[in-house]
Amino acid sequence: MVHELAAYERSAELCRLTDEQLRAALFPAEATSRRERASGADATGPGPALFGHVAESPEGEVFGFALWFLNFSTWEGVHGIYLEDLYVRPTARGRGAGRALLAALAGICQERGYRRLEWWVLDWNPAREFYDALGARAMDEWVPYRVEGDALRALALHPRLAGKP
C-alpha cells in the first residue's frame, strides 16, 4: 500500500521501498538476512525505529495503515510522534479508518506523555480539510529541508565530530 500512497501523491516513480525493507524496519529482530540488516534494520539497536498500525476488515483485509516514529522536542523536553505515512484505500475512505488510525497515535501520545503528533501533507492534498476538522493546524512558519543524493554524499565527506552519537 505504500506504493499506492506514492501513486496517489503523484510520485510513484520515486518509491523504491520493498516488502523486505519494510519488514526489516518494522521487525528488526526478525531481520535475518544480510540484505535486511544492511537496509538499516539494526542501525538503532534491537528495537524498531519504525512503528505501524493497520486498519483491517473483520475478515483481515488491510485497507489502511499509519507508519510512524518517535521524534523529540528539545524545547519541551519530551518525545512526540512523527507520522511518516497515513493511507486509506479509496474504497474505504469516509468510514472512519483514518480517524481511528490517528486516534490510536493520539492515544499513544496521551498514555506516554508525548506532547505532539505531527506530519507533513502535500499542499494540494484534499485530506487537509479532514486534518483541519480534527483540530490539526498547518505549521506555515516552518520550512522543511532535506539533504539527499549527491549532496548527502558530499556532506558526509566533511570532517565529523569525534565520539559516538
Predicted feature locations:
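Conserved GNAT-fold acetyl-CoA-binding loop/helix
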Residues: V2-G40
